[in-house]
Amino acid sequence: MAKVKITLVKSLIGRKKDQIATVNALGLKKIGNIVEHEETPQISGMIKKVSYLLKVEEA
């Protein structure tokens, strides 16, 4: 499985609770935080749900 590098680029202020929970589940808390995950169907679904808040790159 490929690894993806995920960066939070937009604020969570004013977002719906489920979107905030999704970003937190990815391990992101503040703007500029970067995490690496294996690209599983679960992670891909979370990325698609809040894609407008994130920058995603191949690691």
From Swiss-Prot:
<dbReference type="Pfam" id="PF00327">
    <property type="entry name" value="Ribosomal_L30"/>
</dbReference>
<comment type="similarity">
    <text>Belongs to the universal ribosomal protein uL30 family.</text>
</comment>
<comment type="subunit">
    <text>Part of the 50S ribosomal subunit.</text>
</comment>
<dbReference type="GO" id="GO:0003735">
    <property type="term" value="F:structural constituent of ribosome"/>
</dbReference>
<dbReference type="GO" id="GO:0006412">
    <property type="term" value="P:translation"/>
</dbReference>
<dbReference type="InterPro" id="IPR005996">
    <property type="entry name" value="Ribosomal_uL30_bac-type"/>
</dbReference>
<protein>
    <recommendedName>
        <fullName>Large ribosomal subunit protein uL30</fullName>
    </recommendedName>
</protein>
<dbReference type="GO" id="GO:0022625">
    <property type="term" value="C:cytosolic large ribosomal subunit"/>
</dbReference>
<dbReference type="InterPro" id="IPR036919">
    <property type="entry name" value="Ribo_uL30_ferredoxin-like_sf"/>
</dbReference>
<keyword id="KW-0687">Ribonucleoprotein</keyword>
<keyword id="KW-0689">Ribosomal protein</keyword>
<dbReference type="InterPro" id="IPR016082">
    <property type="entry name" value="Ribosomal_uL30_ferredoxin-like"/>
</dbReference>
